[in-house]
Structures are given as C-alpha cells and as structure tokens.
Amino acid sequence: MTQDVEMKDNQTPTQSVVSAPTSTLQNLKEIAALIDTGSYTKEVRRIARAVRLTVGLRRKLTGSVISSFLDFALVPGSEAHTRLSSFVPKSDEHDMEVDTASSNSQAPPKHLPAELEIYCYFIVLLFLIDQKKYNEAKVCSTASIARLKSVNRRTVDVIASKLYFYYSLSYELTNDLAEIRSTLLALHHSATLRHDELGQETLLNLLLRNYLHYNLYDQAEKLRSKAPRFEAHSNQQFCRYLFYLGKIRTIQLEYTDAKESLLQAARKAPVASLGFRIQCNKWAIIVRLLLGEIPERSIFTQKGMEKTLRPYFELTNAVRIGDLELFGKIQEKFAKTFAEDRTHNLIVRLRHNVIRTGLRNISISYSRISLQDVAQKLRLNSANPVADAESIVAKAIRDGAIDATIDHKNGCMVSKETGDIYSTNEPQTAFNSRIAFCLNMHNEAVRALRFPPNTHREKESEEKRREMKQQEEELAKYMAEEDDDDF
C-alpha cells in the first residue's frame, strides 16, 4: 500500500504543487470581481460577502499567490503596488510561471476602484500577521490607515472595520498599543461624522481594549458613556463590547450588571471563539463568587475549558467550603495564572467572602458556639483572634448575612432558628428573575432575526411598475383609437 501511494505521488508531482495556488488565486480573482461589482452598484452586501470569503481562504494565502494577485488587481508600478509588493517575499520561477499562465486567462479590471485597493492592503496585512512579521505588519497597517483617511465611501466601511482591528492588533503584538490611541480617537470621530456605524462599533471596542490594557478604567468608562450607541451591526463586536463593559462594571463594584454583561457575552459568542468564551467565563466566575453565588459545576466541565478553568474551579471550591487557609494556598499556587488573567486583584477581594461563607456554615451548624471556637474554625491567624471573630460576626449580623446574636457576657454567638423561606418574598424574586431572563432572551432572538432589506419598498416598486405598465397599455390603446378616428 505504501509503494502504491508513493508511485501515485511520483506520477503527478506538478499537479499537487500547482493546483493549490492556482485555485486560491482564482478565488481571489472572483472576490476582486465581486468587489468591483459592489463598488459599481454601491452594494455593501457584496463587499461584506467578499470579506467573508477571504476569511475562508486565509490559511491558503502564500507569498506567490498574493504577489500574483497584486499584479492582477493593481496597476504595475503604481504607488500601492510598489508599497505592497515590498512586504511580500519574492516567489520562485515555478510559481511565477503558474501564476502568469493563470492570470492571462482573465484580464484585469479597466479601472481600479478604491475598494479593491483597500482590499489588497487587507490581504497583505492578514498574510504578514499570520507569518508573524509584526513589525512589517505595523508599517503596512499604518499605510492602510493613511490611505483610508482619503476615502469617504460607504462601500469601504466593511473592509475598513477589519483594517482597524488588525491595525490595533499589530501594535498590540509589538507592545506599542499606547502609540495609536490618539489615531483611534480621530478615526472614531471621523466614523461618527460619516455615520459609519460598523466603524464606530469596531473603533469603540478597540479604544476600550486600549484603555483596559493599561488599567485606565475611569477613562474607558467616560468614553463608553459618551460614545453614541445604536443597534449592533456585528455580533462579534457586540460580544466584545459586553465583555469590556463587564470588566469595567466589575472594577466599579457593580457586580450585578457585570455578571449580566459577562454571561450575555459568553452566551452570544460564536462556538468557534473558544478563547473569548474562556475569558468571559473566568471573569463571570469571579463576579458570581463576589456576589455570594456558587457557579454550577457544568461551567467548569465545558468542552475545551476543563484545563484552563481548573484554577478557578479549585478557587470556587475553597470559597464554597469557607476555608480561609485553603483559599490562601490556592491563591499562592496559581498566582502566576491569576496575574496573567489580570484577576489577582479581584481574587484578593474574595477573602471577605470566604470568611462570610465559613461563618454562615458555622451559624447553620451550631445554635450556640463560643467566639474562640469561631476563630479557630475560620482559622484567623492574628494577634487577637477572638476580638477579630467578634468583629466579623457583628458585621455579618449587621449586613444580614447571618441571623444570629452575640452574647457578650459569655463570649459566644447564638444562632436563631431558620424560618420557612417560602413565607418570604425570595421564591417570588427568584422566579421573577428567571422569567425576565427568558423574556429578554426571546426578545434578543427576535431582534437578531435577519429580514431581506427594503422588502416593503420592493412591494411598492412592483405595484408602481404594474400601474405604469397598465397606464402605458391604456395610453397605447387610446392613441391607437385616435389613429383609427383620424383615418
């Protein structure tokens, strides 16, 4: 079997080498034709379709294919052709022969639309980032942004939003993200004036990411609150916005709103974006712990997340038990992981929740217990643990975390009997929150449905066309009758 396979490979060595770049180049030419048509007819959906098709070809892009496509799409010797060709490695003679033969089969467009030139910047930038040539990608992305500033056409907006993203990514990968903040602000201002809503979405998220990268949460919130909001055009951008909003709300101690934003971002994110959903779940777990909730075990056992969420699973277990010593050990064990995830400061806040959880378990288990035993069970390592335990119990009683009293004379905590929870409003509140969640999900699903654009206008135009045709027929009949009368 091995010999047969080797013989087949040896019989047609050129076909296996030639077919891949030829088909990819042909696909790029079809995309160029689609962009040319979209530019001529001013149909944004054609440009959007071209971008989606390019994402599918991303892994097949090679230096020889891109070089041949640049020769096909751009005018040889032009400024754009010279600049972009300098970023692409020179192909060998064999590939050049194949590309030349295939390019002769289809003539290049007579005119060069701005959309096609911007698209060439886009695929070259994709290629450079995939090849990990980040410094060259910075130069290419900067040139593409400079070219974009001179173009004011709505058909470019879809490609421009992609260029904005990779422009920021190239600077982030080289640790120079602060350099482009003023440029992003200027671009966002221009997009707002031009009513480019997709560009506004993308640039707002990039600015929020820029601020949060340097822990500038106050500036991020000021920008977010003053930026114009509208119906989301891209699900990916909306998910990113919810994630950044959840992080800002968490730092501002608004845990309820943060939890809602983070869970919604994780739920709306595409299945393929595993890394993004993991980040959302990490922050959502911490926020739920800060709210006094214990996340379900199923969250930690999701496909592809078991290993990365393991530190947070052990942390959740320590909080659930209320063991302060175990919590400290886990905090030290995974300190590097928490620092990389930028959740270390939030985990420090959890110490108070661990103590309260342990105290709640003690109050449920014992109707009467001395403060010294409380300090031992909570493992308070301080100079005066009894006084600390008394202070902790007093604060928990004041905040309503436990239903108990302190017997100062005997130095003990006396727990009250737990009443019937169904006689309170808690079940009604929980049921109301679940119903509200289901209704919101239904409304979001309805809003997310796609309807053909301008359907009512098409009906009107068909009716008008029918009326005009009927009027023309009546006019022709009337003129024919007049001619008969003349004769």
From Swiss-Prot:
<feature type="domain" description="PCI">
    <location>
        <begin position="239"/>
        <end position="420"/>
    </location>
</feature>
<keyword id="KW-0647">Proteasome</keyword>
<dbReference type="Pfam" id="PF08375">
    <property type="entry name" value="Rpn3_C"/>
</dbReference>
<dbReference type="GO" id="GO:0042176">
    <property type="term" value="P:regulation of protein catabolic process"/>
</dbReference>
<feature type="compositionally biased region" description="Polar residues">
    <location>
        <begin position="10"/>
        <end position="21"/>
    </location>
</feature>
<protein>
    <recommendedName>
        <fullName>26S proteasome non-ATPase regulatory subunit 3 homolog B</fullName>
    </recommendedName>
</protein>
<dbReference type="GO" id="GO:0030234">
    <property type="term" value="F:enzyme regulator activity"/>
</dbReference>
<dbReference type="InterPro" id="IPR000717">
    <property type="entry name" value="PCI_dom"/>
</dbReference>
<dbReference type="GO" id="GO:0000502">
    <property type="term" value="C:proteasome complex"/>
</dbReference>
<dbReference type="GO" id="GO:0030163">
    <property type="term" value="P:protein catabolic process"/>
</dbReference>
<comment type="subunit">
    <text>Component of the 19S regulatory particle (RP/PA700) lid subcomplex of the 26S proteasome. The 26S proteasome is composed of a core protease (CP), known as the 20S proteasome, capped at one or both ends by the 19S regulatory particle (RP/PA700). The RP/PA700 complex is composed of at least 17 different subunits in two subcomplexes, the base and the lid, which form the portions proximal and distal to the 20S proteolytic core, respectively. Interacts with UCH1 and UCH2.</text>
</comment>
<comment type="similarity">
    <text>Belongs to the proteasome subunit S3 family.</text>
</comment>
<comment type="function">
    <text>Acts as a regulatory subunit of the 26 proteasome which is involved in the ATP-dependent degradation of ubiquitinated proteins.</text>
</comment>
<feature type="region of interest" description="Disordered">
    <location>
        <begin position="1"/>
        <end position="21"/>
    </location>
</feature>
<dbReference type="Pfam" id="PF01399">
    <property type="entry name" value="PCI"/>
</dbReference>
<feature type="region of interest" description="Disordered">
    <location>
        <begin position="452"/>
        <end position="487"/>
    </location>
</feature>
<dbReference type="GO" id="GO:0005739">
    <property type="term" value="C:mitochondrion"/>
</dbReference>
<dbReference type="InterPro" id="IPR036390">
    <property type="entry name" value="WH_DNA-bd_sf"/>
</dbReference>
<feature type="compositionally biased region" description="Basic and acidic residues">
    <location>
        <begin position="455"/>
        <end position="480"/>
    </location>
</feature>
<dbReference type="InterPro" id="IPR050756">
    <property type="entry name" value="CSN3"/>
</dbReference>
<dbReference type="InterPro" id="IPR013586">
    <property type="entry name" value="26S_Psome_reg_C"/>
</dbReference>
